[in-house]
Amino acid sequence: MGSSLDLVASFSHDSTRFAFQASVAQKNNVDIYPLNETKDYVVNSSLVSHIDYETNDMKVSDVIFFGWCSDLIDTQSSNIKRKLDEDEGTGESSEQRCENFFVNGFPDGRIVVYSSNGKDIVNIIKNKKEILGADTDESDIWILDSDKVVKKLQYNNSKPLKTFTLVDGKDDEIVHFQILHQNGTLLVCIITKQMVYIVDPSKRRPSTKYSFEISDAVACEFSSDGKYLLIANNEELIAYDLKEDSKLIQSWPVQVKTLKTLDDLIMALTTDGKINNYKIGEADKVCSIVVNEDLEIIDFTPINSKQQVLISWLNVNEPNFESISLKEIETQGYITINKNEKNNADEADQKKLEEKEEEAQPEVQHEKKETETKINKKVSKSDQVEIANILSSHLEANSTEILDDLMSGSWTEPEIKKFILTKINTVDHLSKIFLTISKSITQNPWNEENLLPLWLKWLLTLKSGELNSIKDKHTKKNCKHLKSALRSSEEILPVLLGIQGRLEMLRRQAKLREDLAQLSMQEGEDDEIEVIEHSNVISNPLQDQASPVEKLEPDSIVYANGESDEFVDASEYKD
């Protein structure tokens, strides 16, 4: 797997390395995690190595492809003096070992190959043309450039091992490039906006072996036995029987990001961070794998030799890893990972701390109670069914009361998700709801009504593919207006938060000044008492003495020991 928007997540082929970066826009580095099954894939932070792109005048945000190559390295060779990482030391001696290499593809034609820990650059390959796509297979790197030329390169050599020009898809916009395997035979997958081509590069003149007319495809994979080709687009996962003239035999409604197989299991990483597992011949998914607390799976890799899958999921910008056996997936319909009681205890402690802080802020506490009352209010099942039926009928009748239905107090978040999944079955209904919500939010992005943002959130999450397929100009125009409104509110929000922070600081400063003033008043009273007592001790003896320099003023101020505001010259006084 390569990069997805702002995220880098990629397992090495042997599942012993994982490249990760949660935010390439903010950080110009990638972390390499060493993975060890004997340690249950728990990684000590001291073993994580970092690739700093800035030291070589590169930007990780420019990289369009991340992948891994692997090769058998002769450990006895005098030409290779590479120190084994501490986490890989097993005490066993062997003449060869598998070494991983981290591959980065830049759009300007550069391919930079790093060592397994990222500390060294092994090779830099420079292609004359812009790179459109890339993939890796064992020690080989396959690239597609802007001339629609496919090249096979080795990670440690700059000279291509094989080169050929595409025939099918040459004049189309290519959106995805991938290497596939069918019963041990390497094939090249070319995906355009309307077609999928599977090319056999083994012949002297590479030819197209399969072609499928399918729009907006995102990933392809052969079944483990090579009999079926699986193609995922924005709306569904489709299975074609290659023995029956590439006949479509089955499809599942799911939005897929990554597609892989393990035995007869079809594993699909969905756009909402779950793994759905399917089998040919079964209408429903066999098993769903999710992460507790609404966290997301970012990548996975099947380990065929061990009959298990290794999963990486994101927890507070750090990857966590867990392996699940094939037997568990086939026998359990639903698997939840990250069941950690300690995390729950930490959250409970944090909640208690927040509650204590809010006790000193009556306004915040009152606002919180009002919000909780709105969210946690009990809604009867009959009310939920009734409002769902009313909304469905209004969608059919094109009623003007759709907005009132969406903002009804009978809706809960689970019911909103259920309605979107089960009741919105046509593009027309989807378009009506989206237009209604987008218009209302565009007019007032700061509306305190929390139901419309919930509707928008789950529409974009569950129906993003269908929304993207709507070609209606009116819908696209409303979408642009919505983006503009949300963008302005997004820009204003940090300013408002800053003002809120300053006001809170001023409030605390005023309280501090008040406390300091009271403290100063108390100290002043104590000092006044002490000064009065001290002056009495000094002035009484002076009043008893007949000192020539002592002079009483009309205001009864006593000057002692020559302390006067008049200068007296001693010589003149003597005369």
UniProtKB/Swiss-Prot annotation:
The modification Phosphoserine is found at residues 547, 564. One of its GO terms (cellular component) is t-UTP complex. It is found in: Nucleus, Nucleolus. Keywords: Nucleus, Phosphoprotein, Ribonucleoprotein, Ribosome biogenesis, rRNA processing, Transcription. GO terms for molecular function: tRNA binding; U3 snoRNA binding. One of its GO terms (biological process) is maturation of SSU-rRNA. Residues 340-355, 364-375 have a biased composition (Basic and acidic residues). Residues 340-375 are annotated as: Disordered. Its main location: nucleus. Interacts with snoRNA U3. Interacts with MPP10. Component of the ribosomal small subunit (SSU) processome composed of at least 40 protein subunits and snoRNA U3. In the absence of snoRNA3, forms a complex with other t-UTPs. This complex can associate with pre-18S ribosomal RNAs. Involved in nucleolar processing of pre-18S ribosomal RNA. Required for optimal pre-ribosomal RNA transcription by RNA polymerase I together with a subset of U3 proteins required for transcription (t-UTPs). Present with 20000 molecules/cell in log phase SD medium. This is U3 small nucleolar RNA-associated protein 9. It comes from Saccharomyces cerevisiae (strain ATCC 204508 / S288c).
